């Protein structure tokens, strides 16, 4: 089986009140040593009810999301998308859970810190998700909090497509048609960043022939979303615009914390 069926049921010693446990956590697994520190943090958090390990296929695979939806029993699902150790901030899960309940949001993501292989720790402030935020590489970070009910609704779709790479992206677009993912502007965790390339290099990964299969899936998911919101425009469905005699230059100013 491509998914580990191993789950950690928290003991009474680590759960102060089982009635208050409202999060099931799903983290990628490669070895017991790799998940040890992350597992220890989660087991000590009273908000956590169960911890499940994902093996081999990640949340980009539709079957993985189906597996998660079948096993999640708590009100919310915490999805961690990296193999590196997750370092949660002080009461991070409490903050996420409180904001989720107060705002009635379906999906939340938060600002965080990143640590590069050389040990440098830097803040990673994110931006709010807008209706037009349809890029598959829109930065959400590696920690996502989802309402379990909306994940089950997504899986229960009659026209659910089977993806190898684009399932989590498709889920985000599905949720955005109901309620935009909520940006929590608090630095709630620290993640390790192994890809230290400049942002100008990363943004062209989609044209790399090695990523062709992945990119085609992302395009299909995006096209389905645009059709669902009546925003899809076929290439031959518009009138040709006459050229004007004047030329205008447009300058955009921006501020970036990173090169």
Please state what every model-predicted region is.
Residues 1-18, 204-258:
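C-terminal, non-catalytic tails of nucleotide-sugar-dependent glycosyltransferases
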Residues 15-19, 38-51:
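Short, acidic, metal-binding catalytic loop of nucleotide-sugar glycosyltransferases
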Residues 58-72:
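Glycine-rich, basic loop-to-helix element that forms the pyrophosphate-binding segment
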Residues 74-87:
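Short beta-strand-to-loop acidic/aromatic patch adjacent to the donor-nucleotide binding site
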Residues 121-146, 150:
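A recurrent flexible, glycine/aromatic-enriched loop bordering the glycosyltransferase active site
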Residues 150, 161-187, 192, 222:
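A short, conserved alpha-helix in the catalytic core of glycosyltransferases
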């Amino acid at each position: 089986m491509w998914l580990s069926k191993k789950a950690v049921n928290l003991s009474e010693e680590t759960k102060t009140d089982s009635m208050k446990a409202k999060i099931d956590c799903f983290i990628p697994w490669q070895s017991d040593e790799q998940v040890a520190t992350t597992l220890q943090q989660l087991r000590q958090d009273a908000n956590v009810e169960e911890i499940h390990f994902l093996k081999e296929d990640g949340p980009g695979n539709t079957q993985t999301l189906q597996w998660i939806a079948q096993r999640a029993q708590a009100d919310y699902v915490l999805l961690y998308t990296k193999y590196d150790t997750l370092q949660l901030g002080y009461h991070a899960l409490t903050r996420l859970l409180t904001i989720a309940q107060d705002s009635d949001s379906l999906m939340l993501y938060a600002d965080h810190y990143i640590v590069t292989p050389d040990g440098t720790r830097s803040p990673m402030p994110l931006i709010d998700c807008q209706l037009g935020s349809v890029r598959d590489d829109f930065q959400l970070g590696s920690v996502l909090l989802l309402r379990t009910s909306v994940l089950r609704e997504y899986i229960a779709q009659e026209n659910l497509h089977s993806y190898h790479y684009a399932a989590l992206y498709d889920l985000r677009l599905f949720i955005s048609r109901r309620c935009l993912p909520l940006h929590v502007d608090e630095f709630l965790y620290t993640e390790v960043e192994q890809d230290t390339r400049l942002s100008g290099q990363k943004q062209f990964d989609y044209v790399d022939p090695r990523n062709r299969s992945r990119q085609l899936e992302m395009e299909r998911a995006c096209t389905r979303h645009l059709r669902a919101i009546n925003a899809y425009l076929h290439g031959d469905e518009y009138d040709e615009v006459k050229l004007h005699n004047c030329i205008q230059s447009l300058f955009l100013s921006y501020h970036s914390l990173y090169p």
